[in-house]
């Protein structure tokens, strides 16, 4: 999946499901970087007022999630559970692992 397609796929899932998790987020912006080993990086910025998704990286994210684009696509499509992928070593998390639970809920909301 090309970078632009993947970015739009993330947006198409996260933005409609944002109302499901916004109450779990604080007013302090959380910044998650999805670093794909084979296809660039994406930033998800979320707090209890808004969510933004863009290509790029950030110098001090709340957490960075490292995985392949194939594994991210499988997670987005509901073919792979993000928590299981973490414990299988397919997803590495650098930073605040507990804050990534909101991100996992955001992506699961589509299913």
Where are these regions (language model features)?
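Feature captures hydrophobic
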Residues: 1-111
């Amino acid at each position: 999946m090309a970078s632009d397609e993947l970015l739009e796929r993330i947006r198409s899932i996260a933005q409609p499901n944002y109302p499901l998790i916004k109450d779990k987020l604080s007013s302090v912006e959380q910044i998650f970087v999805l670093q794909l080993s084979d296809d660039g990086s994406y930033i998800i910025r979320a707090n209890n007022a808004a969510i933004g998704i863009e290509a790029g990286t950030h110098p001090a994210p709340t957490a960075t999630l490292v995985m392949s684009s194939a594994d991210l696509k499988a997670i987005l499509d509901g073919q792979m559970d993000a928590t299981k992928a973490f414990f299988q070593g397919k997803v590495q998390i650098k930073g605040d692992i507990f804050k990534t639970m909101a991100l996992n809920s955001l992506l699961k909301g589509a299913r």
